């Protein structure tokens, strides 16, 4: 009856689901994967990132790119997309998805949760982040208040000019252009500048 059904349902859970549901196990796995001080995975995890990072045909991530991509959130790079030198990719707090034929320019910082569409061009020194540090309690240190996330969505055929910042919760509509040096804190409709 009921006991058999419960056992059957537990067998369907993935390892990832079981880890997320067990706080002690989740903490142990996190300690194994992440360095205690640095905000990047331990070196032995980075050695095997080719196993869990999804990359499309012809995609390129230059060697100097910092890949803060632990396996507990999704990362995918579409076919024929490029991440140029000295950029930082980070999915520690949310999934990071980059579509096909997309170019992430020099020295970009991309912190999930983010969904970047197809044929998107991010010029040099662009920051796109779905992460924000909490600071509601003036009695507590900011670094003790945790973080919050709001997904960023960059739809297809968008161009973001150099030195721009795209903040959490923003959607850049299809075929829009963000001028160089912009700070984008509100969503931008499709086909606009």
Regions found by a protein language model. Give the residues of each.
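Domain-scale signature associated with acetyltransferase and cell-envelope carbohydrate enzymes
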Residues: 8-129, 155-156, 164, 190
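Short, Lys/Arg-enriched N-terminal segments with co-localized hydrophobic residues
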Residues: 1-9
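Glycine-rich hexapeptide-repeat left-handed beta-helix
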Residues: 115-193
